[in-house]
Amino acid sequence: PAGTGTIGRVEQIGTPQEVYKHPANKFVAGFIGSPAMNFFEVTLEDGRLVGPNRDFSLQVPEGNLKRLREKGYEGNKLIFGIRPEDINAEAAFLETFPNSVVHAKISVSELLGAESHLYCQVGSSEFVARVDSRDYLETGAGIDLGFDLNKAHFFDPETEKTVY
């Protein structure tokens, strides 16, 4: 088992895979994984995650949406987390899930052999996507990226604990 914590406090104990896939809170989610998990402050509006200044809007899958509504987040703020590898540039994903696509500007592009890290911006929100090197684009380019919301994580903005 692995333990993750802050000074003087254990935040979560579990196998590395459990901690990675099911973090107990935002601290643990951001601590494990490289690049780190992306976090966005959003509002849940009519089944969509709406970013700051309405910079983006993503349709929440039905199962996730039901749980978020049951917990009282419809119309309220929450923190949406997604790992860089759960952001896709592949045409098949973009076509299959058009309601989870954002158009981003690449701030920094790192070609790392078989994969690329794209540091992107949508309005005031910044994030990193880990994509196949075939999807590499130069800094300054625009790119459509799809967020796999079936792998999304949600955190309460006050407690930073995982919502479910």
Which stretches of residues belong to each language-model region?
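Internal alpha/beta loop-helix hairpins
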Residues: 1-57
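Glycine/charge-rich catalytic "coupling/switch" loops of P-loop NTPases
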Residues: 21, 48-106, 136-164
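Short beta-strand micro-motifs in enzyme catalytic cores
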Residues: 38, 78-79, 116-118
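Conserved beta-strand residues within beta-sheet cores
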Residues: 25, 36-41, 84, 101-106, ...
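Short flexible coil/turn linkers enriched for glycine and charged/polar residues
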Residues: 34-36, 74, 112-114
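Glycine-centered tight beta-turn/hairpin loop motif at sheet-sheet or coil-to-beta transitions
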Residues: 53-55, 122-125
